Amino acid sequence: MGLLCSKSNRYNDAKAEENAQTAEIERRIELETKAEKHIRKLLLLGAGESGKSTIFKQIKLLFQTGFDEAELKSYLPVVHANVYQTIKLLHDGSKEFAQNDVDFSKYVISTENKDIGEKLSEIGGRLDYPRLTKELAQEIESIWKDAAIQETYARGNELQVPDCTHYFMENLQRLSDANYVPTKEDVLLARVRTTGVVEIQFSPVGENKKSGEVYRLFDVGGQRNERRKWIHLFEGVSAVIFCVAISEYDQTLFEDENKNRMMETKELFEWVLKQQCFEKTSFMLFLNKFDIFEKKILDVPLNVCEWFKDYQPVSTGKQEIEHAYEFVKKKFEESYFQSTAPDSVDRVFKIYRTTALDQKVVKKTFKLVDETLRRRNLFEAGLL
């Protein structure tokens, strides 16, 4: 009898403990569900090379703890890969121009750099890249300074040459140091195509502060083959942040060299606007890479892009830069209203001029985005 009572007590104790654990799990789930309701979901979209992943990294630097040493070190092979890939692009591009261009002679690599170029092109075509040594850096520097490579670099818009090229080529000695650890600037400029989805949680006024919203920002792949993965993120989004590389009006896609990047961006922007799940979603348009745009517009006319063929320059210098920027901005405004259903006109639409590499600009922009979305929430709650 005593044994039966003992077993019964142990059973009751175990059952009580199990019930307590279940109740605790349910309580935590309820708390997490409530917490989730206060987290605003932001979707970071844009075509490939729009700079959205740089924006994402800036958020980590600005509103979180940044990159620790282990994370910085993890970018070392990425930086070195960018260097090798870029030199291969320029070397192979110069050979192509030397074969096909009327003024072919200026694209012929000098005799002393010919073998170096072939060697570096072979390395750039590998799946695994060697660590950048002082010897390799010296060879890369030699071919980078070759007149033919500089002529080719001047036509970089035709070759998918990345924005980080000049920066990394001017820092080869530092990048090849045996104790090299990437800096935050190196990380911001390092190019890795986003595949799949990455996310980050942050508050523009500090995590967990009562006065500030908490956001979860999702960055998804920008290349065409990545876009089918977006759909499961669409529901419940507070805002779409759509990035446009306004400097790339004269460039073609990485995945389709017959397609102008700006035309692709226009079509993507209009496609996103027409998605039913975004009818009530706020849109924040980041006209990004303004730093590159303001230099390029003085040399490359805006009307080389089919969408901007009606553009007429009015001046030179800073006045022309502003005129060209306002023209592009107006084009996107027109595109927005033409692609927006009449019953969606009450959703918020804002345009911001951005340079993803400029931390002050990004910080100021996200503070403005935060203010806009908080006012929207108050309006929807009937408090404004």
Curated annotation (Swiss-Prot):
<feature type="region of interest" description="G1 motif">
    <location>
        <begin position="41"/>
        <end position="54"/>
    </location>
</feature>
<keyword id="KW-0564">Palmitate</keyword>
<feature type="region of interest" description="G3 motif">
    <location>
        <begin position="215"/>
        <end position="224"/>
    </location>
</feature>
<feature type="binding site">
    <location>
        <position position="53"/>
    </location>
    <ligand>
        <name>GTP</name>
    </ligand>
</feature>
<feature type="binding site">
    <location>
        <position position="52"/>
    </location>
    <ligand>
        <name>GTP</name>
    </ligand>
</feature>
<dbReference type="GO" id="GO:0005525">
    <property type="term" value="F:GTP binding"/>
</dbReference>
<dbReference type="GO" id="GO:0046872">
    <property type="term" value="F:metal ion binding"/>
</dbReference>
<feature type="binding site">
    <location>
        <position position="222"/>
    </location>
    <ligand>
        <name>GTP</name>
    </ligand>
</feature>
<dbReference type="Pfam" id="PF00503">
    <property type="entry name" value="G-alpha"/>
</dbReference>
<keyword id="KW-0519">Myristate</keyword>
<dbReference type="GO" id="GO:0001664">
    <property type="term" value="F:G protein-coupled receptor binding"/>
</dbReference>
<feature type="binding site">
    <location>
        <position position="53"/>
    </location>
    <ligand>
        <name>Mg(2+)</name>
    </ligand>
</feature>
<dbReference type="GO" id="GO:0005834">
    <property type="term" value="C:heterotrimeric G-protein complex"/>
</dbReference>
<feature type="region of interest" description="G2 motif">
    <location>
        <begin position="186"/>
        <end position="194"/>
    </location>
</feature>
<feature type="region of interest" description="G5 motif">
    <location>
        <begin position="354"/>
        <end position="359"/>
    </location>
</feature>
<keyword id="KW-0342">GTP-binding</keyword>
<feature type="region of interest" description="G4 motif">
    <location>
        <begin position="284"/>
        <end position="291"/>
    </location>
</feature>
<protein>
    <recommendedName>
        <fullName>Guanine nucleotide-binding protein alpha-1 subunit</fullName>
    </recommendedName>
</protein>
<feature type="binding site">
    <location>
        <position position="49"/>
    </location>
    <ligand>
        <name>GTP</name>
    </ligand>
</feature>
<dbReference type="InterPro" id="IPR001019">
    <property type="entry name" value="Gprotein_alpha_su"/>
</dbReference>
<dbReference type="InterPro" id="IPR027417">
    <property type="entry name" value="P-loop_NTPase"/>
</dbReference>
<comment type="similarity">
    <text>Belongs to the G-alpha family.</text>
</comment>
<comment type="subunit">
    <text>G proteins are composed of 3 units; alpha, beta and gamma. The alpha chain contains the guanine nucleotide binding site.</text>
</comment>
<feature type="binding site">
    <location>
        <position position="54"/>
    </location>
    <ligand>
        <name>GTP</name>
    </ligand>
</feature>
<feature type="binding site">
    <location>
        <position position="288"/>
    </location>
    <ligand>
        <name>GTP</name>
    </ligand>
</feature>
<feature type="binding site">
    <location>
        <position position="291"/>
    </location>
    <ligand>
        <name>GTP</name>
    </ligand>
</feature>
<dbReference type="GO" id="GO:0003924">
    <property type="term" value="F:GTPase activity"/>
</dbReference>
<feature type="binding site">
    <location>
        <position position="51"/>
    </location>
    <ligand>
        <name>GTP</name>
    </ligand>
</feature>
<feature type="lipid moiety-binding region" description="N-myristoyl glycine">
    <location>
        <position position="2"/>
    </location>
</feature>
<feature type="binding site">
    <location>
        <position position="356"/>
    </location>
    <ligand>
        <name>GTP</name>
    </ligand>
</feature>
<feature type="domain" description="G-alpha">
    <location>
        <begin position="38"/>
        <end position="384"/>
    </location>
</feature>
<dbReference type="GO" id="GO:0005737">
    <property type="term" value="C:cytoplasm"/>
</dbReference>
<dbReference type="GO" id="GO:0031683">
    <property type="term" value="F:G-protein beta/gamma-subunit complex binding"/>
</dbReference>
<keyword id="KW-0378">Hydrolase</keyword>
<feature type="binding site">
    <location>
        <position position="289"/>
    </location>
    <ligand>
        <name>GTP</name>
    </ligand>
</feature>
<feature type="binding site">
    <location>
        <position position="163"/>
    </location>
    <ligand>
        <name>GTP</name>
    </ligand>
</feature>
<dbReference type="GO" id="GO:0007188">
    <property type="term" value="P:adenylate cyclase-modulating G protein-coupled receptor signaling pathway"/>
</dbReference>
<dbReference type="InterPro" id="IPR002976">
    <property type="entry name" value="Plant_Gprotein_alpha"/>
</dbReference>
<feature type="binding site">
    <location>
        <position position="188"/>
    </location>
    <ligand>
        <name>GTP</name>
    </ligand>
</feature>
<keyword id="KW-0460">Magnesium</keyword>
<feature type="binding site">
    <location>
        <position position="194"/>
    </location>
    <ligand>
        <name>Mg(2+)</name>
    </ligand>
</feature>
<feature type="binding site">
    <location>
        <position position="50"/>
    </location>
    <ligand>
        <name>GTP</name>
    </ligand>
</feature>
